[in-house]
Amino acid sequence: MVKRGSKVRILRKESYWYQDVGTVASVDKSGIKYPVIVRFDKVNYAGSSGSPTGVNTNNFAIDEVVEIS
């Protein structure tokens, strides 16, 4: 079971971070579809308002991440 602080590999093929490793920021237990929030070192391509920075977190389902040691 993934928990906060776990290192995980992303299995969602359409994700920008597919096969990348990130750190679990939180796991929501309320029953939502994508409860695992993962933070990454690199940002994606979607900078906001002309800012050079993009998004570095994303939500995933439990079966879209695998914990690594």
UniProtKB/Swiss-Prot annotation:
Alphabetical list of Gene3D superfamilies matching this protein: 2.30.30.50
Native source organism of the sequence: Trichodesmium erythraeum (strain IMS101)
HAMAP family according to UniProt: PSI_PsaE (MF_00613)
Descriptive protein name: Photosystem I reaction center subunit IV
Record's function text: Stabilizes the interaction between PsaC and the PSI core, assists the docking of the ferredoxin to PSI and interacts with ferredoxin-NADP oxidoreductase.
SUPFAM superfamilies cross-referenced by the UniProt entry: Electron transport accessory proteins
InterPro entries associated with the record: Elect_transpt_acc-like_dom_sf (IPR008990), PSI_PsaE (IPR003375)
Predominant location category: membrane
One Gene Ontology term, aspect cellular component: plasma membrane-derived thylakoid membrane
Membrane topology note: Peripheral membrane protein
Localization in the cell: Cellular thylakoid membrane
A GO BP entry: photosynthesis
PANTHER family referenced in this protein's UniProt entry, alphabetically: PHOTOSYSTEM I REACTION CENTER SUBUNIT IV A, CHLOROPLASTIC-RELATED, PHOTOSYSTEM I SUBUNIT IV
Record has Membrane as a keyword: yes
Keyword presence, Thylakoid: yes
Pfam hit, one: PSI_PsaE
Keywords, ordered alphabetically: Membrane, Photosynthesis, Photosystem I, Thylakoid
